[in-house]
């Protein structure tokens, strides 16, 4: 049987014997998962085990689930799933009222020497090769967006950064990283050549992608959620994904685990 590349055009199905290792927290109301960076959140045409929600339904045997916070396919890390509508509303309200602090870990191209706050509005880019791409814009349709980047480790080629999105726009971290001139490593859309995304969609992983991308997916990981509820704070953390961990071990001389 041909082995499927998890970061290829056609990702493999979820192995339910491995699924329990993704669980960060579970009780009768919540399921918090550390999603791998090759899996879509929403159900797809390829069956229940082709998506995170489908795998969760298989695991919990619940038909009704509430995806409180989702991630793009190639972003790893925390995904919050509520098992009851009332719990979903509680968490969604906290997000809407900005009673939550989110922290991501990102590997950026280039040496970001000091922390910076990016306060640049974001809009959909109407023209261009990649139709789903957003960009920094002062157009009237643009929405305000604020992201804070704090370097943890830096060498000549890469930076491991803590990233704090203070708003929740689509692709916000990636758009702001591109605007700064320090795109996320492995980003096919907001990296140095967006035609790589088209090639990936049409052909899967190719030699040209291998030559131009330092990772097979975007090096972005949702690391922490800290909620401020009336009945007390709640924090969830997801260990860094294995592929990003391996990249850091290879490219940074310092012990990056001491910096997180």
Regions from the PLM with identified roles:
Residues 1-23, 176-260:
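Pseudouridine synthases involved in rRNA/tRNA modification
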Residues 1-146, 152-155, 233, 240-255, ...:
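RNA pseudouridine synthases
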Residues 91, 169-177:
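Short beta-strand segments enriched for Tyr within beta-sheet-rich domains
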Residues 107-109, 163-166:
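A structural micro-motif recognizing beta-strand termini
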Residues 156, 161-164:
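Short histidine-centered loop motifs in beta-beta connectors
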Residues 166-171, 241-243:
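Short solvent-exposed strand/turn elements
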């Amino acid at each position: 049987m041909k082995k499927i590349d998890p970061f290829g055009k056609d990702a493999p199905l979820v192995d339910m014997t491995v699924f329990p290792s993704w669980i960060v927290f579970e009780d009768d109301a919540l399921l918090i998962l550390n999603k791998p960076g090759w899996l879509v959140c929403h159900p797809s045409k390829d069956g229940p085990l082709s998506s995170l929600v489908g795998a969760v339904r298989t695991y919990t045997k619940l038909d009704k689930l509430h995806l409180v916070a989702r991630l793009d396919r190639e972003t790893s890390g925390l995904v919050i799933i509520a098992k009851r509508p009332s719990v979903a509303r509680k968490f969604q309200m906290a997000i809407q009222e900005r009673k939550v602090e989110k922290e991501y870990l990102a590997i950026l191209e280039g040496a970001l020497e000091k922390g910076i706050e990016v306060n640049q509005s974001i809009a959909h880019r109407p023209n261009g090769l990649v139709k789903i791409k957003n960009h920094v814009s002062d157009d009237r349709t643009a929405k305000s967006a604020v992201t804070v980047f704090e370097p943890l480790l830096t060498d000549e080629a890469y930076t491991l950064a803590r990233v704090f999105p203070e708003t929740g726009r689509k692709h916000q971290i990636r758009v702001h990283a591109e605007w700064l001139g320090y795109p996320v490593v492995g980003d096919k859309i907001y990296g140095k050549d967006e035609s790589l995304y088209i090639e990936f969609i049409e052909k899967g992983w190719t030699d040209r992608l291998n030559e131009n991308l330092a990772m097979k997916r975007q090096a972005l990981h949702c690391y922490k959620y800290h909620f401020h509820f009336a009945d007390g704070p709640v924090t969830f953390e997801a260990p860094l994904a294995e592929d990003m961990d391996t990249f850091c071990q290879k490219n940074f001389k310092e012990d990056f685990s001491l910096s997180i």
